[in-house]
From Swiss-Prot:
It is a multi-pass membrane protein. This is Rhodopsin. A motif ('Ionic lock' involved in activated form stabilization) lies at residues 131-133. It comes from Sargocentron xantherythrum. PROSITE patterns: G_PROTEIN_RECEP_F1_1, G_PROTEIN_RECEP_F1_2, OPSIN. SUPFAM superfamilies: Family A G protein-coupled receptor-like (SSF81321). It is found in: Membrane; Cell projection, Cilium, Photoreceptor outer segment.
Length: 348
């Protein structure tokens, strides 16, 4: 059922469909589902905010962590905090009420922050892939990834993310409640007159999904070939090769995590867009959308688990300058992030 600034996934043959901005949507699913949704968002908030804030705080406190590669990783933490503060808190509040009680303004803000976080994450992973390709494969001789390049990379991620998330705020497409009507996203559902949803969705999928994914797959495809060649030729020391492999492994796992979280949502969104008017239940979009939101906690978790130096610095921060697990954290100086300035293979 389509209405002004909303689309409820139910045929209004019984006349029970109401605006998700004004009435509880308990006719869509059992009211308990809204409580579960709210509890899930609360979990993401109490986990996502501390780990992302700690990632920022520890990096700013410890000078040795302020490497060019870490600028991009910090950018991911900032994006996740935007999702937690601007998106998750709003969705938890609306879930508790059973409808989007904050109105259109709240919907625009929630949709904007949630989409912004996802876009910054994807473009950050594309920049990381380019960094790994340039550092490891050396397509440009004597090139060193430095602070200026990292700042340019961060600026690119924000520029591209804003190019995707601002248009719906100013009339090219729009943000509307989706699924159980407690969170908002791009309007994939309607051909609302005056909003040009079709052209925006095509622009979004081509320029802000296909392009960064193509960059990621190209860079890592070249990188894998180069790593195999280097291993066969033994052109660099084992320590250098191992450090580069560890950094690359961490970034690849982040990419896989992003795809696991966001690919189901993107696939469902594309299906809805190409099958407008087809019947589907509220959970069809709700489950992928809320699964995608879990991406706000996996990036810092991967970073903490796979980076010895950062883990060591975080523990010393938490324990007031001491590391009670010093023996387990030995070798922290051989870091994954410091390895970003090294190269382990010959030019690709």
């Amino acid at each position: 059922t389509e209405g002004p600034y909303f689309y409820v996934p139910m045929v209004n043959t019984t006349g029970i469909v109401r605006s998700p901005y004004e009435y509880p949507q308990y006719y869509l699913v059992n009211p308990a589902a809204f409580a579960i949704l709210g509890a899930y968002m609360f979990f993401l908030i109490i986990v996502g905010f501390p780990v992302n804030f700690m990632t920022l705080y520890v990096t700013l406190e410890h000078k040795k962590l302020r490497t060019p590669l870490n600028y991009i990783l910090l950018n991911l933490a900032v994006a996740d905090l935007f999702m937690v503060i601007g998106g998750f808190t709003t969705t938890m509040y609306t879930s508790m009420h059973g409808y989007f009680v904050l109105g259109r303004l709240g919907c625009n803000l929630e949709g904007f922050f949630a989409t912004l976080g996802g876009m910054i994450s994807l473009w950050s992973l594309a920049v990381l892939a380019i960094e790994r390709w340039v550092v490891v494969c050396k397509p440009i001789s004597n090139f060193r990834f430095g602070e200026n390049h990292a700042i340019m990379g961060v600026s690119l991620t924000w520029g591209m993310a804003l190019a995707c998330t601002v248009p719906p705020l100013v009339g090219w497409s729009r943000y509307i409640p989706e699924g159980m009507q407690c969170s908002c996203g791009i309007d994939y559902y309607t051909r609302a007159e005056g909003f040009n949803n079709e052209t925006f969705v095509l622009y979004m999928f081509c320029c802000h999904f296909t392009v960064p994914l193509t960059i990621i797959f190209f860079c890592y495809g070249r990188l894998l070939c180069a790593v195999k060649e280097a291993a066969a030729a033994q052109q660099e020391s084992e320590t250098t090769q191992r450090a580069e492999r560890e950094v690359t492994r961490m970034v690849v796992i982040m990419v896989i995590g992003f795809l696991v979280c966001w690919l189901p949502y993107a696939s469902v969104a594309w299906f809805v867009f190409t099958h407008q008017g087809s019947e589907f239940g509220p959970l069809f979009m709700t489950i992928p959308a809320f699964f995608a939101k879990s991406s706000a906690i996996y990036n810092p978790m991967i970073y903490i688990c796979m980076n010895k130096q950062f883990r060591h610095c975080m523990i010393t921060t938490l324990f007031c300058g001491k590391n009670p697990f010093e023996g387990e954290e030995e070798g922290a100086s051989s870091t994954k992030t410091e390895a970003s300035s090294a190269s382990s293979v010959s030019p690709a």
